[in-house]
Amino acid sequence: MTPIAPSLQQPVDAFLRYLKVERQLSPLTQLSYSRQLTALMRLAQEIGVTDWTTLDAARVRMLAARSKRAGLQSASLALRLSSLRSFLDWLVSQGVLHANPAKGIRTPRSGRHLPKNIDVDEMNQLLEIDLNDPLAVRDRAMLEVMYGAGLRLSELVGLDCRHVDMAAGEVWVMGKGSKERKLPIGRTAVTWLEHWLAMRDLFGPQDDAMFLSNQGRRISTRNVQKRFAEWGVKQGVNSHIHPHKLRHSFATHMLESSGDLRAVQELLGHANLTTTQIYTHLDFQHLANVYDAAHPRAKRGKS
């Protein structure tokens, strides 16, 4: 494989340092940028671009066309061009480029499908776990919190004990772009957190992480995914259970009950309303009121 020219690589390395140090983006987002820009640099060399100052709109279209021919789907191609636009915007801000040649170049639109979710009956079936050991209590608490608050997997794993106000039934989470938000979690989730916290010390906690592995360390995302899938099979739920499906189900059930798109946007932590609109075929008190009135586990108060 031909080495990437330093005239392409060095500006990309500087941009990635900017994303890490100044923007403080998550490691996964940084990795996504790195992968997309590495692929683009290799394609750029194939079409004779060895310096970013020689990239023009015609060559950007060539990069998009080659990516498409390589089998990239519309959503992935849109992500690649978005990464390129962000990088070129940064080069403009650094005085390397006078204008962004990728501005205005769009990929063909692909239909956005409603994410698959679990219906309320299946969700109740999943959550009726036989609590025969502390790990089952931990898993029940994780399931209740994830579905009860619509958390991202990274937000669930990153939750610390100090982030939870049990009396108020609220959690503080750090979402995408290091944006913090306060969320209601409902009475049922609070109850199961209390059950879990009564057993947490059995795991020999090594820090303030809310959910622990057998070794007393913060549970990993891979472990959560594995445990959720296993519980789906054990509970006889027809749907394959993975963490993001619980978030989709939270959003769908909330919208079905409340019809309040803006409130659900805030609860999910979406920066743009259009992201939340895929679920449709303010102040915190308002969000809490919508939540209490609409979320199945808040209304039932099951334990």
Swiss-Prot record:
SUPFAM superfamilies: DNA breaking-rejoining enzymes, lambda integrase-like, N-terminal domain. It comes from the Bacteria. Disruption phenotype: Defects result in partial SOS induction, inducing some overexpression of the nuclease NucA protein. Residues 113-292 form the Tyr recombinase domain. Its main location: cytoplasm. Keywords: Cell cycle, Cell division, Chromosome partition, Cytoplasm, DNA integration, DNA recombination, DNA-binding. Coiled coil: none annotated. FtsK may regulate the catalytic switch between XerC and XerD in the heterotetrameric complex during the two steps of the recombination process. The active site is at 152, 176, 244, 247, 270, 279 (o-(3'-phospho-dna)-tyrosine intermediate). GO terms for molecular function: DNA binding; tyrosine-based site-specific recombinase activity. Residues 6-92 form the Core-binding (CB) domain. Site-specific tyrosine recombinase, which acts by catalyzing the cutting and rejoining of the recombining DNA molecules. Binds cooperatively to specific DNA consensus sequences that are separated from XerD binding sites by a short central region, forming the heterotetrameric XerC-XerD complex that recombines DNA substrates. The complex is essential to convert dimers of the bacterial chromosome into monomers to permit their segregation at cell division. It also contributes to the segregational stability of plasmids. In the complex XerC specifically exchanges the top DNA strands. This is Tyrosine recombinase XerC. It comes from Serratia marcescens.
